[in-house]
Amino acid sequence: GVSVPGGKVAETSEEVEAIAREFGGVVVVKAQIHAGGRGKGGGVKVCKGPEEAKAAADAILGMQLVTHQTGPEGQKVKKVWVEKGSNIKQEFYAGLTLDREKVRDTFMVSTEGGMEIEKVAEETREKIVKAAIDPAFGLQPFEATRLAFALGLEGKAVRKAASFFMGLYKAYTESDASLAEINPLVLTDEGDIIAVDAKINFDSNAMYKHK
């Protein structure tokens, strides 16, 4: 139930150029490191064609990308993700993590998509809506629908967002993740709800179950 744009991984700028030519139109070249905030560090480039995509890959591949989540040493970019461009109407944030104080998984959504959620929490905390999930029942459809309404969605977009949230929760629990962030979560001009970017952390104590 988690919709994503089409895309492919590449390790060279020549591969990026070929993928961009295959996709046609606008593509997004994204550095593949395990950290958020890549856009601010120059690790995400929107490109109008194959030549721009190749140039972007030349700039990103091999760079030491520093973000607010990598620390000052940064991380070296060895691969990029080439993604089909989306017709974005509105951006949101959606995330799941364990609230250690309440000892419950908590679903969070915000209308402030594309921004660092830590900054939103610090400056405009009221723009983050949270739902503590009862572990005995898991995320319920009515809770997912309530979260969709909290984003100001209407009509079919509410149903699609609720379905997306149910799918994200299922992926989060079945993979024993400790964090799942979709930022941005996008409403397209066509009325679809898709994950344009994501970050997932897994519980290292549960890795043996997935070998």
State what each model feature region is.
Residues 5-7, 29-58, 93, 116-117, ...:
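Glycine-rich phosphate-binding loop of ATP-grasp-fold ATP-dependent ligases
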Residues 23-39, 67-88, 94, 168-172, ...:
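ATP-grasp fold ATP-binding core
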Residues 143-185:
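A long amphipathic alpha-helix within ATP-dependent nucleotide-binding catalytic cores
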Residues 27, 31-33, 95-100, 107-112, ...:
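Short beta-strand elements
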Residues 116-157, 161:
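Cap/lid and interdomain-hinge subdomains that line or gate substrate/regulatory clefts
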Residues 70-132:
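Hydrophobic alpha-helical hairpins/lids featuring a short glycine-rich hinge
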Residues 189-211:
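Acidic, glycine-rich loop-and-beta core segments that form the ion-binding/anion-interacting portion
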Residues 1-25, 31:
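A conserved helix-loop-beta module that forms one wall/lid of the active-site cleft
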